[in-house]
Structure formats: structure tokens, C-alpha cells
């Protein structure tokens, strides 16, 4: 590999490391980084005449799915408004190939991610806890709701969703490099702090999905039963402490969920007529059903 190619490769590796941060900064930065990575991947593929990425079942299946999306979108009433988004769907598969390509080219990239991830998570979770305890984050962004925290996302209450999507990746990389005991313990502590912070954000969907994921991992991972029970006990104990000092967490995660799912009346202490969906979501369900009935085979498009 030439010196120029090495510099380009290092630049692309650096851009990959910046991806988690770019989600916090804004969608424009994400699009710029992904576009650069995709173009570089295509450039190197053409230069080296390596078309193996396009000659496999994954790419063929994606092409079939992509054609299906284009076809179904023609029947959409909003094609003129959304056609650009639909046409550029192909960038998802190219982005996946680009990541795989640069992981192969830079043998140390995964290790760089392993070292860089704790720094990102530490800043984000420290900022989240700071906002929880002091009602504003490190940049001075206030809480937009008393029972929710958003950190660097300002008025977008997506901190829990953001972290819950990164935790599986972070945990996977940590287990991959589990031989380094010090970093493994450090990363597990950061992951534990992240799980608690997701609970504190008040995002129930993100929290419950993460709990299901963690329970599955704890069940299938090759640890002693004592260690598994200890992990569950520690997490439950930490949750209990925060609930004790802030009962609104229990109200949001448990009481509101039971009320919405089972139409429970806490004042009368009884269940009313159980509904399978909240009242405010009924128009969405009925509209979706009508759209499906109009085009049962190929749908209405994305």
C-alpha cells in the first residue's frame, strides 16, 4: 500500500471513529461522513478491481429488495415528495460494505474503536448524570421535562434510544477483547453506568428493549451462574436506589406502562376495559390498515 493510500485509510478510520459523535452533532455531519466513506470504498474497489462485495447473495438480495421498494413507491401518494429518499436507499448497503472494507484494510481499527468508545461513552454519560442531578448539562442545556433528560440532544428526548443502540455494539467489542482484564472491567463499569442512565432518561421503549437484550446475553454468555445472578442483583439494586430517591421513575416506567397497557385506574384500584392499543394511536392503526387494504401485495412504499 502506498503512502497516499495509508493516509487515506487513516483518514477513513478516523471518520469511522467519529460516527458515534456525529449522531450527537447532527444529521448533516452523518451524511457527510457516510458519503465520504462510500465514495472511498467505491474508488478503492474500482482501482483494485475488487468486485467481490457485489458478487454475493447479500448484495443480490438487497438489489431485489431495493427494486421492490422502488416499485411499491410508485403507488404511493407521496412519491413526488419522497422519491429522493427512496432512490438513495442503496447507500445503506454500500455503507455496510464500506465499513467491512475498512475493517479489513486497517487491522487495528477494531482495537481503535475499543479504545475510543470508552471516551465517547464517558463524556456522554457524565453529561447525562450531570443534567440529572443539576437540571442542566455541561453545555448549559436545561431539562425540557422534569422526568426526562436529554443531554447533548437539547430538546430531542432521544438520549436513551441513542445509548441503547450503541450498548450492544460496545458490549460485543468489549467481550471480543476480554483478555485485557483492566479495560474489560473499565468498559463493563461504563456499560453498567450507561444502562442506569438509560433508565434515568425515562425512555421506556429504549429501556425495556435493552433489558430484554441484556437478559438474553446473560443467559447465553459463558459465565458462572453466580456471576450472572450478581450482575442482575447489582443492576436491580442500583435501580432501587434511584427509585427510592426519585419515585417519579417508578411512576413513569411502571405505573404509566401498566395504565396504558391494561387501562388500569389507580384511583379506583381496578382495571377498566382492556384495550390493545392506546386511544391516541388508534388513527395510526386504522390509517395503516386502510393503506394495506389498498395495496395488499406490494404495499404503499417506504
Short names for language-model regions:
Residues 33-41, 88-91, 209-214, 232-233:
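Hydrophobic core segments of alpha-helical transmembrane domains in multi-pass membrane proteins
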Residues 81-88, 146-150:
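Non-cytosolic membrane-interface motifs at loop->transmembrane helix junctions
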Residues 39-45, 90-97, 216-221, 240:
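Alpha-helical transmembrane segments and their membrane-interface exit regions
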Residues 1-84, 101-111, 115, 173-185, ...:
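Transmembrane signal-anchor hairpin modules in multi-pass inner-membrane enzymes, especially those
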Amino acid at each position: 500500500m502506498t503512502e497516499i493510500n495509508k493516509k487515506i485509510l487513516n483518514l477513513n478510520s478516523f471518520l469511522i471513529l467519529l460516527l458515534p459523535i456525529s449522531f450527537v452533532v447532527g444529521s448533516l455531519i452523518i451524511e457527510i461522513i457516510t458519503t465520504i466513506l462510500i465514495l472511498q470504498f467505491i474508488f478503492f474497489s474500482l482501482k483494485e478491481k475488487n468486485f467481490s462485495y457485489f458478487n454475493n447473495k447479500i448484495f443480490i438480495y438487497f438489489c431485489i429488495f431495493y427494486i421492490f421498494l422502488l416499485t411499491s413507491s410508485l403507488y404511493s401518494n407521496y412519491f413526488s415528495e419522497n422519491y429522493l429518499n427512496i432512490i438513495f436507499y442503496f447507500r445503506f448497503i454500500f455503507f455496510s460494505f464500506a465499513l467491512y472494507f475498512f475493517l479489513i484494510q486497517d487491522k487495528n481499527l477494531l482495537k481503535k474503536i475499543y479504545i475510543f468508545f470508552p471516551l465517547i461513552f464517558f463524556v456522554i454519560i457524565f453529561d447525562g448524570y450531570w443534567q440529572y442531578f443539576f437540571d442542566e448539562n455541561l453545555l448549559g442545556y436545561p431539562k425540557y421535562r422534569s422526568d426526562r433528560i436529554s443531554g447533548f440532544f437539547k430538546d430531542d428526548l432521544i438520549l436513551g434510544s441513542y445509548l441503547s443502540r450503541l450498548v450492544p455494539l460496545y458490549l460485543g467489542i468489549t467481550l471480543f477483547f476480554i483478555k485485557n482484564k483492566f479495560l474489560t472491567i473499565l468498559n463493563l463499569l461504563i456499560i453498567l453506568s450507561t444502562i442506569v442512565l438509560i433508565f434515568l432518561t425515562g425512555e421506556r421503549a429504549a429501556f425495556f428493549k435493552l433489558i430484554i437484550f441484556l437478559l438474553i446475553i446473560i443467559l447465553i454468555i459463558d459465565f458462572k451462574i453466580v456471576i450472572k445472578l450478581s450482575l442482575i442483583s447489582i443492576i436491580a439494586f442500583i435501580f432501587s436506589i434511584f427509585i427510592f430517591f426519585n419515585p417519579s421513575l417508578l411512576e413513569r416506567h411502571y405505573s404509566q406502562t401498566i395504565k396504558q397497557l391494561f387501562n388500569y385506574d389507580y384511583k379506583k384500584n381496578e382495571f377498566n376495559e382492556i384495550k390493545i392499543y392506546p386511544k391516541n394511536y388508534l388513527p395510526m392503526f386504522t390509517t395503516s390498515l386502510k393503506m394495506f387494504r389498498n395495496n395488499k401485495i406490494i404495499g404503499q412504499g417506504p
